[in-house]
Amino acid sequence: MTQATATAVVHDLIGVGFGPSNIALAIALQERAQAQGALEVLFLDKQGDYRWHGNTLVSQSELQISFLKDLVSLRNPTSPYSFVNYLHKHDRLVDFINLGTFYPCRMEFNDYLRWVASHFQEQSRYGEEVLRIEPMLSAGQVEALRVISRNADGEELVRTTRALVVSPGGTPRIPQVFRALKGDGRVFHHSQYLEHMAKQPCSSGKPMKIAIIGGGQSAAEAFIDLNDSYPSVQADMILRASALKPADDSPFVNEVFAPKFTDLIYSREHAERERLLREYHNTNYSVVDTDLIERIYGVFYRQKVSGIPRHAFRCMTTVERATATAQGIELALRDAGSGELSVETYDAVILATGYERQLHRQLLEPLAEYLGDHEIGRDYRLQTDERCKVAIYAQGFSQASHGLSDTLLSVLPVRAEEISGSLYQHLKPGTAARALHEHALAS
C-alpha cells in the first residue's frame, strides 16, 4: 500500500488542472489580492510541464479565435499578462503586426500560455495527478476537502482545502467500435497525434495507409499534415456527414461567444437552452475553417488532374467494425448512400472524434451525496446541499447551462473574474477548516 504524505498547509483553494481556465483564474486572484488580501492557492496538473494541446500542435495549426480573446484582455486590456504584452516582451510585436492577422499559430499561443504560467510557479505543481477528492466532516457537515494526488515518483500527497475548482479539461472520446483496440499503437486519438506519428514507419519514409475518422477541424488538420509532411502516406478521410462543413464565424453569429450571451443562456428554461445550443451548433462542432476546406478540396482536385489517386474522401460512411490483425486495422465501412458494406485494411487509424467532459463527476464521486444532479450556478459553483460548506467550482463543464463558449477560450477572463469574486465572498476568516485539518493530522 502506498504511504500518503499529508501537508500541514490548509489551502483556501486548490485547482485541479492548470490549463488556460485556471491560469486565467490565477491572474484574477492575483489582481483581487491587491485590494482584498491574498489567498493560499495551489494548482495541480498531471502534465510534467506546461503544454496546451502539445501533441496536436502541427505547423499548419492556427488559433480559431482572435488573439484579443487571450487570458485577460476582455476584462483588463492593460494587464501585463496580455498576448500583446507577451509579444512586446519577446520583441515580436512589430513582426506580428506585419503579419496582418488576428489569428496566431497555436504553437505561438501555446508559448504565450507557458509564459504566463511561468509567473505562477509557486502556486502550481506539475506531474501530480489528482486521484480523488474526499469530504472532511465535522458535526455532519463538510467543512473542508481532502485532495489526494500522486506525483511522478508514485508518492501520494494529501492536502486540505476550503474551496475547490475543477478544470482538468476534456478526455478523448473513443467511439464504441474502437474501444476493444485500446492499447494498440496503430489506433490513437488526435490528442496524441504527434507522439504516435513519430513512432509510425512513415516517419522514416516507409509507405503507410492511414484512416482519419471524423469530419471536424482536427480531422482536417491531420489530413493536411499527413499530405504535406508524410509523402509516403495514403490518407483516407472517413466521415458520416455528406461533406466537410464550414464553421460559421460571421460577426453576428460570433456574438454567441460574447460574455453577455452567458447571461442570456443561463436565464432561459432548459428547453430554450437546448434550442439555442442546437441553433449555434455549427459554430464549433463538426465544422472546419473555410480556408482549410479549400486546401483539402484542392488536394483532391489536383489528384484528378494528375490521375494519381493518393488519398480518398469517404463521406456518408460509418465504421461498423474495427478488428486488429497482423496485416493492420481492418475496418468494415458502411456507405449510407448505397448501403454497401466494404472492408479496408489500414496501417494506422487516427480518431479525430472529439472530447467528453465527464471527468469532474469521477473526481467528485466521493461527494456525490452532497451534489445532487451536479447543477452549476451562474457563478460556476456547484449547487450543494446545506450540509456542504465548501465552495466547489467547475470550469469547462457547463455548456448545457452557460452556453457554447464554456469549453472555449472566449470567456476565460470574464469567467475567472466571476469565480474569483464568488470565492472571496464565500471564504471568510473562520477557523473551522483549519481546526478540522489539525485534528485530522493529530489522529
Curated annotation (Swiss-Prot):
Cofactors (names): FAD
Membrane topology: Peripheral membrane protein
Enzyme Commission (EC) number: 1.14.13.195
Subcellular location: Cell inner membrane
Cofactor note: Binds 1 FAD per subunit.
Residues the entry annotates as binding NADP(+): 215-218, 240, 284-286
Residues the record lists as binding substrate: 69, 254-257, 284, 410
A GO biological-process term: pyoverdine biosynthetic process
InterPro entries, per the entry: FAD/NAD-bd_sf (IPR036188), Lys/Orn_oxygenase (IPR025700)
Positions bound to FAD: 45-53, 64, 130, 407-409
pH dependence: Optimum pH is 8.0-8.5.
Pathway linked to the protein: Siderophore biosynthesis; pyoverdin biosynthesis
Entries under Gene3D superfamilies matching the protein: FAD/NAD(P)-binding domain
Entry function: Catalyzes the conversion of L-ornithine to N(5)-hydroxyornithine, the first step in the biosynthesis of all hydroxamate-containing siderophores, such as pyoverdin. Pyoverdin is a hydroxamate siderophore composed of a 6,7-dihydroxyquinoline-containing fluorescent chromophore joined to the N-terminus of a partly cyclic octapeptide (D-Ser-L-Arg-D-Ser-L-N(5)-OH-Orn-L-Lys-L-N(5)-OH-Orn-L-Thr-L-Thr in strain PAO1). Specific for NADPH, which plays a role in stabilization of the C4a-hydroperoxyflavin intermediate.
Record text on subunit structure and interactions: Homotetramer.
Homology family: Belongs to the lysine N(6)-hydroxylase/L-ornithine N(5)-oxygenase family.
Name listed for the protein in its UniProt record: L-ornithine N(5)-monooxygenase
Species: Pseudomonas aeruginosa (strain ATCC 15692 / DSM 22644 / CIP 104116 / JCM 14847 / LMG 12228 / 1C / PRS 101 / PAO1)
Source species taxonomy: Bacteria, Pseudomonadati, Pseudomonadota, Gammaproteobacteria, Pseudomonadales
Gene: pvdA
